[in-house]
Amino acid sequence: MNKALKVLLFSLLALSLFVVAACGSTEEPAEEAPASEENTEESTDEANDETNEEAALEETGELVVYSSRNENFVNALLEKFTADTGIEVKPLHAGDNAVSRIKGEAGNTQADIFISNDIGALENLRLEGLLEGSDPEGIESIDENYRADDNSWFALSARTRVLMYNKDLITEEEMPKSIEELTDPKWQGEFAITRGGNGGMIGHVSALRNEWGDEKTKEWIADVKDNAGAILEGHGDIRRAVGAGEFTFGLVNNYYYHQQLQEPTDNNVGVIYPDQGEGEMGAVVNAAGVGLVKDAPNAQSAQVFLDWILEEENQREFSYESLEVPINPEIEAVEGAATISDYKTHDMPLSQLGEVWEDTRELIEQAGLDLDL
């Protein structure tokens, strides 16, 4: 066979193979395309879900929590969070310095979550643009009166200002029934209060300013300071001193009374919820809660924490550890504790505490009560 014929035959063979291939093709792959795209979308959704679940761990694998609460009230809660989620917590128990630290780190945020013993401090941070709004799962379990408009903070447990007394030294009938009575000379040296910078004291004075005005409140602070037998670092110091009989009574948050009742000794104490009479202001209520710090470095971890803390069992853990009263009405208070619906309370909205928080600190100092010992 000559060379030209071979080329011709080879060309005809190639052409026939091309025709067969073309005729044998169908539109089926094109018809299956939508199903293929659907599978791809499902796979993408599943991948996104997995990514969201793992995102918190992929950021840094940790959560930085600043807290102004007693670390004994917080540590077990944070350990439970780590056990439940796998996210490691780096806590900073900064006491009253937590707020100033967050303010000082503005623009270089280190904290993700702030756990506060004072709603006024949380609202003050929000007003200064240092907290960030959120929509955590379960937020509807917290009444709107106990959370920011943008949910950047929310309360979890309530505490009320009370007079805890030693039953071996005084009877309930003999006890003062109003906060104003603490200026009476008859109580000179008989009671103890905290330093002015304590969160409970700041919130209490803010409520008195709302009720009485600044001048009367300043006079009350000065007179109570002079009348008190001691000014102590914190309420735990007061409750132990009252239980031991070092003072007849002390001005504390109500859960310290319940803590003293659980002591093996020095537990013969009683409690007075002040200003319950007709026309009186009612007992002053504050709350502890959590806030989402703006520009949190571990934003995904912070969101996981907010969702987690609003689960009912964790709300219970938050309040029961300190023997406070849960804000969520669906959670029963600890045995023997009065709920805020059981007594008359002052009507100042907690959200207003933040508006006057810094001014109240200044007024306390002006009245002569040191913020720190």
Where are the predicted features?
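C-terminal motif of bacterial Sec signal peptides marking the signal peptidase cleavage site
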Residues: 19-22
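Immediate post-signal peptide segment of exported/extracytoplasmic ligand-binding proteins
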Residues: 28, 32-33, 45-64, 79-85, ...
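Early extracytoplasmic/lumenal segment of secretory-pathway proteins
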Residues: 55-124
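Periplasmic-binding protein-like
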Residues: 141-144, 159, 189-196, 221-225, 231-232, 308-331, ...
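A bilobed periplasmic-binding-protein/Venus flytrap-type ligand-binding module shared by bacterial periplasmic
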Residues: 164-169, 285-298, 317-318
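Ligand-binding pocket segment of bilobal, Venus flytrap-like solute-binding proteins
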Residues: 207-274
